[in-house]
Amino acid sequence: MPVQLKNDTLKGTFLIASLNQESDWIEHTFVRTVVLILEHSSDTGAVGVIINRPLGEKVKLYSSEALRKVTEGIDLTGDTEKVSKIFFRGGPVKQDSLVFLHQLEDIIPDSVPIFHDLYAGGELDALRAHDTVMDSAEPILRFYLGHAGWNEGQLEGEIERGDWILCPGNSNLVFSPTPETVWQQALYTMGDKYRPLSFFPEDPIVN
């Protein structure tokens, strides 16, 4: 399904890494990633977060102090299993910074709408007052350490080169219970010529 640009912006769009990203001559930072674009302008560039790189056990590489720092005092370090499911590596830029996505616009003021049922940022103080959101059975919150960024015209050049496949964003993939398969899920839902790519093995030699 092609993406229709609104006001010449890719905000709210998924960038699905094409197999071009697996070429030897390209840095492999974004191999099999899905990036949600949070900001985009032809004049200033783009900012997004990788939605399918959960920290998992790697969350242990971040000290309790560091986690508290990036969450501005929200103590999420008591339950490592829980934290490992909601913390993601958002990208290679400013990995000591925090971006968070949620569906809590009713309780978090100043949230920025990304699309109809997904919001970014807002006042973390309000989140502290609603600890129950961390215990919700349904995923409604994700934290991303770092982000992906492109200078003016850079992303457009990568798209033209075929490095990215554009897909309309949706919250189901952002909050997928199996983020490790989001790349495959995104391609499969695209259908047509993209669906077969979702079955392409990471190492064709061993297939």
Language-model features, listed with the residues they occupy:
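A short aromatic-anchored loop/beta-hairpin motif
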Residues: 1-144, 148-207
